[in-house]
């Protein structure tokens, strides 16, 4: 392994040194061995990972720090947030030259913990581990999970739970909130150094802050387009949870939709639906506006405005490409928006499972009967006849072989999705000491487009009573 600490040494004013705190009777629950090997960390023993992530004993060369940042939370500005329970242990320099943060969540109190205990619970740690690996397998930019450690440490949320840690990794955990903190705390002179750090280590192909902001806009637009196409709701899109690298960051009360509910809210702390599924594109733009305001004075205002003006076009362009691919369409036609709109209206009014519908839609052929597996999903198949006929006519104009189209659709419409019901089953078993369900679910999610008949029980509709469940922010 090759550990470096560029953030801690080059931006010492943006972090505080912190000693991680040990958990009571920690136990190693999972290692992402494939990813560890990719990062050149496969030489670290299981014992050392347990010591690092559970016993408060960083590996040689690590300099743990908690980063400081601010953020707009549910529309209101919080001037000083920071890593309240996570530590940047160091950065691994992989064989290809890419830097990878080693970021330990649940490591104990930091100067930014405020009234928190600095801990993470097993429930939320499992959810983060599963989600980061699931989104990665779906091709959605995200932080990744390396190590999961459980313990007998009592942690109090709505009820008593047990403490855990997740070692997560990404090229950087820099957020919109990092820029905001220095912009609005009277330390604006430090923003050029942050921009320079980002350009040198993460955007070497770019030359200045204007180009950097344009790229952040582009990446944010594409990320949210991918979320929308995948039916993924983040749940807490505060600016401190927005990555400057365009990654899915900080998994809290997230959720994939089951039945198609456009205004799906997965966070019960969001009664007004500010961060509902269908609001994510607009929230992304609002957050980028706040980032632009923080950069004003350091980046040309006209350049900021020009980049912001491109956001909606970039998001809709990528989203349209993704949805056409999900329907097996390779060409754009003027009627496509109407075709999509009618589909979404039917899905919503009928409460049809979004993921299973798209997966089984791939079985439609140019002629013959409608697939029985598809019809079985529809409460009232007669209501669908008009749309299905339009879709078949559209496929006929496209041409191509049915088998080829099905293979292409299967490669973008997952069979296995991280449904909250499945995650909860894995959590319940893990809290009882059984990691088997977690292991099975993780394995299925890491190959979401493959048939994997041994995991077929994980690809069935969830009970109707569970659909649309909201979750707590507590973790």
Swiss-Prot record:
UniProt keyword list: ATP-binding, Magnesium, Manganese, Metal-binding, Nucleotide-binding, Nucleotidyltransferase, Transferase
InterPro entries: SelO
Residue numbers binding Mg(2+): 241, 250
Catalytic reaction annotation: L-seryl-[protein] + ATP = 3-O-(5'-adenylyl)-L-seryl-[protein] + diphosphate; L-threonyl-[protein] + ATP = 3-O-(5'-adenylyl)-L-threonyl-[protein] + diphosphate; L-tyrosyl-[protein] + ATP = O-(5'-adenylyl)-L-tyrosyl-[protein] + diphosphate; L-histidyl-[protein] + UTP = N(tele)-(5'-uridylyl)-L-histidyl-[protein] + diphosphate
Source organism, top-level taxon: Bacteria
EC numbers, comma separated: 2.7.7.-, 2.7.7.108
Active site annotation, chain numbering: 240
Keyword Ion transport: no
Entry's Gene Ontology molecular function annotations: AMPylase activity; ATP binding; magnesium ion binding
Function: Nucleotidyltransferase involved in the post-translational modification of proteins. It can catalyze the addition of adenosine monophosphate (AMP) or uridine monophosphate (UMP) to a protein, resulting in modifications known as AMPylation and UMPylation.
Family stated for the protein in its record: Belongs to the SELO family.
Name this protein carries in UniProt: Protein nucleotidyltransferase YdiU
Phylogenetic lineage: Bacteria, Pseudomonadati, Pseudomonadota, Gammaproteobacteria, Aeromonadales
